[in-house]
Amino acid sequence: MINIRKTHPLMKILNNAFIDLPTPSNISSWWNFGSLLGLCLIMQILTGLFLAMHYTPDTSTAFSSVAHICRDVNYGWFIRYLHANGASMFFICLYAHIGRGLYYGSYMFQETWNIGVLLLLTVMATAFVGYVLPWGQMSFWGATVITNLLSAIPYIGTTLVEWIWGGFSVDKATLTRFFAFHFILPFIITALAAVHLLFLHETGSNNPTGIPSNMDMIPFHPYYTTKDILGALFLILALLALTLFTPDLLGDPDNYTPANPLSTPAHIKPEWYFLFAYAILRSIPNKLGGVLALLLSILILIFIPMLQTSKQRSMMFRPFSQLLFWTLIADLLTLTWIGGQPVEHPYIIVGQLASILYFLLILVLMPTVSLIENKLLKW
């Protein structure tokens, strides 16, 4: 009798995606982050569901409902901090996943890559609206500053901002709709992730060499299921260590002060995972220019496949491109640091230089160096 997993309509889909899936035999631990992102998403949906059972999306009670979760609900503090730090782990995995794609040329699977960029934008939107929900000072002012950026759009900007706010400032209507968005978006992310996988399984996985591996495939189970479980254990260990030892390490102390529209915090800044984009936004003195640079800093990923000038897909055998790649990583870390600093000398000029270097590396230097490498190899 043929195995049920190969005949049953539902089991067949799961079998072809996670059990009998032909996988390159040489993919490294950098390929673990896809499954880790799936794990993060499941954890965030579960912890978020339990938080939503006790949270009230109302300006007068939101802050105290979060305090109530932490003080009175059984293990509420644990669920809350798992959710908050889970978001940080989500972004760490996300950035590692994108970095892997850039390094090994996975962006040449264009449909998979474009869905991935869409996923990144959706996760960023989810994290942003989620940060507003505790209704602390940084929640309120972060929401005010970021939504206000839309007013830079000519002609319709102001109307658009008031439409998103549901009034003339960030208030009860804004909080209620942000809670609704924060609840629905993870399910949209889940659907997009399924489409992401669908397109990936059309082509099969890339591998570190960037050379097609059709002649050397192994089944996903048990080899990569085991490997993914090990990765998951490390992720859970890191998340638990962060949550149980230093739960507020990555948070902002201002968010322990209830939102007050009459008092502006000294330094308004987003969560750490948005600081690089925030630094690029602030480095341009013009409002519309800043907003466009902010958008382009993320949307530039869509153009990466078009900027591929190398005859080799992966950077594995391209030392000059590797140097530029790690320069880009260092530049992003610099931008992240600058985004958390006050707007004063020397941070302003460092931020501007780092922003220029970011776009210069991606749009000019990397494609040019790839062409030089082709010449050196007489290709």
From Swiss-Prot:
Binds 2 heme b groups non-covalently. The chain crosses the membrane at residues 33-53, 77-98, 113-133, 178-198, 226-246, 288-308, 320-340, 347-367. CDD domains: cytochrome_b_C, Cytochrome_b_N. SUPFAM superfamilies: a domain/subunit of cytochrome bc1 complex (Ubiquinol-cytochrome c reductase), Transmembrane di-heme cytochromes. It is found in: Mitochondrion inner membrane. One of its GO terms (cellular component) is respiratory chain complex III. Gene3D superfamilies: Cytochrome Bc1 Complex, Chain C. Heme b b566 binds at residues 97, 196. Its cofactor is heme b. Its main location: mitochondrion. A ubiquinone binds at residue 201. Belongs to the cytochrome b family. Heme 1 (or BL or b562) is low-potential and absorbs at about 562 nm, and heme 2 (or BH or b566) is high-potential and absorbs at about 566 nm. Component of the ubiquinol-cytochrome c reductase complex (complex III or cytochrome b-c1 complex) that is part of the mitochondrial respiratory chain. The b-c1 complex mediates electron transfer from ubiquinol to cytochrome c. Contributes to the generation of a proton gradient across the mitochondrial membrane that is then used for ATP synthesis. The cytochrome bc1 complex contains 11 subunits: 3 respiratory subunits (MT-CYB, CYC1 and UQCRFS1), 2 core proteins (UQCRC1 and UQCRC2) and 6 low-molecular weight proteins (UQCRH/QCR6, UQCRB/QCR7, UQCRQ/QCR8, UQCR10/QCR9, UQCR11/QCR10 and a cleavage product of UQCRFS1). This cytochrome bc1 complex then forms a dimer. This is Cytochrome b. It comes from Lagenorhynchus australis.
